Amino acid sequence: MSFMMALANSTMFTTSGIYHVTSLGLNPFELVLMGTVLELTVLIFEGITGVVADTYSRRISVIIGMFILGSGFTMEGSVLWLTGAGSIISVFAWIVFSQILFGIGWTFVSGANTAWVVDEVGEEQAGAILMRSQRLSLTASLLGIGCSVGLSMITPNLPYLIGGMLYAMLGVLLLIVMKETKFKRQEHAPQASHFKRMTGTWLSGAKVVRKHPLLGVIIAVTLFSGAAYEGYDRLWQPFLISGIGLPDLKVSMAVWFGVVSAAATLLGLGGVRLAEKWIDMKNERKVSAAMLLLTMIRVAAILSLAVAPNFAWAIVSVLIAGASVSISEPVYGTWLNMNLESKTRATVLSMVSQSDALGQTAGGPVVGWIGSRFSIRASILSAGILMLPVLAVFGRIIRKRI
């Protein structure tokens, strides 16, 4: 599952900046606003779908999500054709529709997939499994980068069409092979309505957050990290294109971004492999220390990109930021699951995701406005500053564990 999702995502997103900027003509504010629409959708639906996964089935939730994601990405790839002669709906409106489908589909998968893995293999093995899954995902990303560059050179929207098809195929495959053997539904009154069952599950998840103060702090801090990384993730490609400028070589933009993404993925693969050897994924304090270090590296890389005077400096900053994200994802997932109960795992993970979505929804437009009002460089600088509170939180967590 992780391999196929990473392959589809890499195929679509490696050259997404070229498609959105050069083919669809979106400006910095619209680029961030489309992300805001996505995250607002996640904010609205994440709690509902997380409760569905904990109340009924993680497997069903994941499969539904795959088909919705496939539909959303196919729509996004079809915008060039949907806005042809005679169309009364604008390019940006179609992008908004596709982002809404993307958001709804992702909420069905988010939380449910990790909860399913942890329940099936057990908490003690989950950290190692998530690390191996990340390595497989990064390997798939390398394949997707090549596909994205090749498809984009044929026509810029083709990567999204192929990515949507891959998600639909994955949904069919999971219907056949995905099993759910360890999931236990929460007990409810026999005559309880679906709404009462889902409300009971959500309240149980909220109790878990209240009982773990540090988990509540993490949820609050994701507001800042969500706002920060939304701006960075949407704007680093346009920044290289118009803010720094690509080298004057006989190489297309698709190839440039393919090379950058491949290099970042290779760095991430090496970093994940080292993390598997050096980090005791069963030791919560060591996992927290690793998160502090990785967050420091990411913040430094984003700030470095904001002040980059030339292309070489900017590329090194982008590579370091990308590699730090690749390594931190499984480490962060492991840390969260160390503090969660099985019966409400998907619900609490969805709450964390909602907090991230709220941060992106509230802060993303501000970062985008800064880019339109002043410069993209100023947007990226503000994104780095917004991530600084995260460092204080992980430092506090480590002190609590000593």
Functional labels for PLM-detected ranges:
Residues K179-I219:
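Juxtamembrane intracellular "pre-TM" segments in multi-pass secondary transporters
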Residues L130-V149, S355-G363:
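Glycine-rich segments within core transmembrane alpha-helices of 12-TM secondary carriers
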Residues M1, V32-V37, L43-I44, I48-T49, ...:
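C-terminal transmembrane bundle of multi-pass solute transporters/carriers
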Residues M1-L43, L214-S261:
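Helix-loop boundary and gating motifs at the non-cytosolic
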Residues F3, G72, G86-V109, A312-I327:
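Hydrophobic core of transmembrane alpha-helices in multi-pass small-molecule transporters
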Residues F67-I89, M296-P309:
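C-terminal ends and interior cores of transmembrane alpha-helices
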Residues G163, Y167-Q191, R396-I402:
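Helix-loop junctions on the cytosolic side of multi-pass membrane transporters
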Residues S98-L138:
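Cytoplasmic helix-loop-helix junction between adjacent transmembrane helices
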